[in-house]
Structure formats: structure tokens, C-alpha cells
Amino acid sequence: MSTQYTTGILGYNSHNDRYGLLVCDLWEIDGFHCGETLDVWDYDKEQWIPTRMEMSWNKGWYLVDTNYCGSDLEGLRVRVRQ
């Protein structure tokens, strides 16, 4: 049986100060917590990159082992396991 994913974009949720998963402009996940895993689409390599959401006082929210942090997260194509 293949793994099922929900795919959408990252968006900042000002109600809880977290980045969440938007699908068709609706919150599928209203906010990720530190340590939650997801995949981010790398347009240059044309592949999914596994990562996790974290937060630091210096750079705010960021994706581990990527260059994405802070407002750079807005609009990224991501997927999460169902």
C-alpha cells in the first residue's frame, strides 16, 4: 500500500503565530509545532526534500537542513503524510 500525502502550501497563521498547511486557501493544518515532519518541494532538483519545522529566537520558524526560514516559508509547496 502506498503512502498517502496531503499537498498544499505553507502559510503564516496570525491567529496562532505558526506556519500551517493551506489547501485551496483553507487550513488543512492550522499550525505546525516544533519537530513536526513534512516534505518541501525543491524546484531546482525537482524532488521532495524531507525536513521538519523548528523555531529559534534568532531566525524564527525554519525548515531543518534547508535554507528556508522566516518569511521565506510563505508559499512553499509542501506535503505531509496523512
Describe these PLM feature segments:
Residues T3-D30:
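Mixed-charge, Lys/Arg-rich low-complexity intrinsically disordered regions
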Residues Q47-Q82:
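Short, compact, well-ordered microdomains
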Residues L10, D39-D44, E54-W57:
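Short beta-rich binding modules
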Residues E28-Y43:
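Short coil-to-beta transition motif at edge beta-strands of beta-rich domains
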Residues R18-C24, L38, G60-L63:
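Short polybasic amphipathic segments
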Residues S2-T3, D42-R52:
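Short coil-to-beta-strand transition motifs
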Residues D25-F32, P50-M55:
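Short linear motifs in intrinsically disordered
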